[in-house]
Amino acid sequence: ALGLWCSAAAGKTARTLPCKEEGLVLSITTFDGKSESKPFLKCFGHTWIGLDNRTGHTVYLKDRAIPDGEMVTFSVWAVSGLSGLLFDLEPCYIANYGRYTGRLSLSTNIGEEQLKVIEDYMEQHDKWTVDKNCSYWSIHLWNAVVGEDAALKIRGFVCTPEKIEQAFSAFDCVEVDKDFSRAGDIYCYKDGERT
């Protein structure tokens, strides 16, 4: 179910991000975890970045070829033995386990030169830590790539999916349950090496 979620700010000072379904489309997606929480078991959610290639040609992110019409997702994870940067894990969770229903995404077009900004960020920040979790990692990468007009701002020191969802309210519409089915196979980067 594809839809748009309109924030309380719509019609006031909400901003619209330019996003055509062509070129490179960068997205930040967040899921607050509430629908997956159970009594005595809290799900804190997850946040990740997506890159959708609609350029008409193959682009490269690190050593990953992304052919036209395909996409890649990535974020840091606290997976046992793999506290690094994982690629295309989220689409697997969505397709095989029905996870992240109700996820919210904000998207904008970027230039191919911004791929270098993403790669540099990945080189410097390829690990999950308690204070630099998936939400912290994703929002800082997003802000480094998109610039001030599309930057997301949160309050407080701890970055969570719920705070990113609140930051989305600065924009007039956000996509609900974005489709990530065109992503590839799962792999990991840790200490600059692909595994």
What are these regions (language model features)?
Residues 11-132, 164-195:
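Non-catalytic ligand/cofactor/substrate-binding and regulatory segments of enzyme domains
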